Amino acid sequence: MKTDGFMTPDELMRLSRDYVLEHGGLTILSLDYVVENGKMFGESLWWDRSDGYYICDFSGDEEVYFTGLGYDIYKNGNIQFYRYYKNGLEDGIEAKFYPSGVLKSYTVIYDENKIALAYEWYENGMIKMFFDRDHEYIFNEHGEITEQGQV
């Protein structure tokens, strides 16, 4: 990555949503899959703030830390986000979407809340933020790096 605040058009293109989806090996789950295999927030999943923001499953007789796929949906029926949990903590893939249904961000989380890789895009597909285990880059709508740092 560049350190002077600018990237070549080719470098920016490689961080665009379309390029990353096509060449980056990201798998995006369908709404049908998420609804069929996950649990929706507000129905049986809730934050337990007294326990440090663990996700709890209240669908049974007792509260248990949730392991599995959780999600929420916008009022228009489009998926808002889905993410995997292990023992009540984020662990696995998290995908967030704009109300239009377009992918907003994709994050890989490991060891229950540590981020390995994260992308966030503007709705038009331009990169907004890129994070890996070593660096973080924030971009404006013109593709210029506005913030960067080592992690």
Predicted segments, located by residue:
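Glycine/tyrosine- and acidic-biased, solvent-exposed loop/turn segments at the edges of beta-strands
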Residues: M1-V151
